[in-house]
Amino acid sequence: INKNFFDDKLSLNATVGASINDIQEDAMYLKGGLEQIPNFFHYGNINVNTSKRNESKWHDQVQSVFASAELGWNHQLYLTVTGRNDWASQLAFTSKGSYFYPSVGLSWLVSESVKLPKAISYLKVRGSWAEVASSPNRYLTQMQYTYNEQTNTYEYPASHYNTNLKPENTKSWELGVNAKFLGNRINLDMTFYRS
């Protein structure tokens, strides 16, 4: 959405979307000494008496919906708000199967609002707050059997799974100034942030 209101004094830019990130692996690994032909690295040339097999099979999926909106006033003041919700397979079998993380930012183009000295071509101040979340590694919330190469069997896991696991959250904020001087010949970009 890209709309202007009140004789172009108020602007609205908005986006809504969804995504699926789906990653899978289904692999078998075979290692061992070579049988007859030197430097011929092929599974048919591996000595069956020394060979060891390992299998890996996993499937991760994150389903997401997201939205962002920017409200502008008189080409001077801008408010930006975003939000995203993820459903991650790594958090299956937990009470916290999905997680939401928002952000909000405010910027002011001072050079469009106030008469500044000629030496200052452009001046903008900005501030924002954001929260970011990420899911844990796979198999921490459900039982995983491990493959034993010596016995060629799957074994009961030594560690227990955690159904109370939650996503990792990071909150941060930042303040900044962008300035240009002497007809845009000198640029200054300063940011102070904390995470």
Describe the predicted segments one by one.
Residues 1-195:
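Extracellular/periplasmic, surface-exposed regions of secreted and cell-surface proteins
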